Every structure is written in structure tokens, then in C-alpha cells.
């Protein structure tokens, strides 16, 4: 397992970090490399796309260093705004509204969900499970719900119990096309449906 940690500073003080874990899973065909990310920022330094951009940068470096490896992003997202951040930048991020998940994605997700306890299947390609709940105030929870969008509505439909610690299991194949699509959409401020 590799564990890059990216720290963000402002005037010599740490204001946030993104911990990116890369786990190697052996399968009958070939090894899979599963990337996950956990980020946190001080309140005044949020909403600047640092989490996604730093993850894309690390992943591009890994992809260039190991071009033949199957690399996937799999994470249980515990907030609707975080789901929106990822789903709005790539059409290859699943699950998503009105788009069935490809079979190879479901197979990888099946491997990962077997590593968690109390996984609930809420539709054909939607899985949730209990996660460690980030510290949030009631005001923050209300604000998370007030930002309506197609992606947030999808998240809320399938994970209305996120505020008690349920996380939506999400997946994205990290091939070069997906990474470039996400990077361009972030840099141009463009969102996908």
C-alpha cells in the first residue's frame, strides 16, 4: 500500500491535507490498484477544488509511472457536496442518475464491498455502508441539503441517512481519458450531468 499525503499551507500554517491511499488487490486475471482519498480543510480554505486537483495530480503521476496498471478510484462518500464534486467532473463516475453502471465497475465494486461490514444494496448499482462520521454542526448539515442539483438530489435519494454516518460507495476507472476529462472540467469550471 502506498500512502501519499498532500498538505496545504498558508503563511507557514497547515490549512488542510489530502491522504491518498493506493491499495493493491490481487484477482484471478491481474492485480487492481484501488485509490481512495480522505481530505480535510479548515473552514476558510474549503471550496477551492484542492481535494480533486491534488488527487488528479497524484493519479496522473502514478498513471504515467505505471501505464499498464488498472487503477480505480473507490471511496465511500459521506456528504452530498463531496459526491457532487466528483460526479459533476466526470461522466465515468458511478453511481449516477439514470445511467447504469458498467459491468466491469460493478465487479470491482463487488470486490471492495466484501471488505466492508453492513453493506446495504439500495438499487442495482447503489451500495452504502456505515462510515466514520466527520464532525459537522447541525447548521453545516442543513447547508449541505440546501444546495440542490441533479447530483445532490441523486445522493439524497439513495443516502438520506448520511448524517448518521452512511456512506455512498462510489467508483471511477482512472484511465487517461477520465483523468483528462476531470482535469479539464475542473480547470474550466465546467460540470457534467
Residue positions per predicted region:
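Mid-sequence acidic-hydrophobic segments that form the walls
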Residues: 21, 42, 58-65
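Conserved beta-strand in the GNAT
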Residues: 7, 13-23, 35, 40
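Conserved acetyl-CoA binding element of GNAT-fold acetyltransferases
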Residues: 31-43, 56, 75-76
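A short, polar/charged loop-to-alpha-helix boundary motif
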Residues: 25-31
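Short, hydrophobic/aromatic alpha-helical segments in well-folded domains
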Residues: 4, 35, 58-61
Amino acid at each position: 500500500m502506498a500512502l501519499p499525503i498532500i498538505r496545504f499551507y498558508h503563511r507557514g500554517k497547515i490549512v488542510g491535507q489530502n491522504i491518498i491511499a493506493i491499495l493493491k488487490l490481487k484477482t484471478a486475471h491481474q492485480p487492481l490498484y484501488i485509490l481512495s482519498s480522505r481530505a480535510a480543510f479548515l473552514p476558510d480554505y474549503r471550496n477551492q477544488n484542492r481535494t480533486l486537483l491534488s488527487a488528479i495530480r497524484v493519479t496522473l503521476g502514478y498513471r504515467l509511472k505505471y501505464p499498464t496498471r488498472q487503477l480505480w478510484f473507490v471511496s465511500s462518500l459521506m456528504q452530498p457536496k463531496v459526491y457532487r464534486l466528483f460526479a459533476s467532473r466526470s461522466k465515468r463516475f458511478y453511481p449516477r442518475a439514470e445511467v447504469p453502471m458498467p459491468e466491469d465497475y460493478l465487479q470491482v465494486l463487488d470486490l471492495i464491498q466484501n471488505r466492508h461490514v453492513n453493506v446495504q444494496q439500495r438499487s442495482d448499482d447503489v451500495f452504502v455502508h456505515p462510515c466514520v462520521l466527520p464532525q459537522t454542526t447541525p447548521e453545516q448539515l442543513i447547508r449541505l441539503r440546501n444546495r440542490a442539483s441533479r447530483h445532490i438530489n441523486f445522493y439524497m435519494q439513495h443516502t438520506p441517512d448520511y448524517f448518521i454516518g452512511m456512506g455512498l460507495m462510489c467508483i471511477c476507472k482512472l484511465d487517461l481519458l477520465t483523468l483528462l476529462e476531470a482535469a479539464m472540467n475542473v480547470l474550466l469550471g465546467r460540470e457534467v450531468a
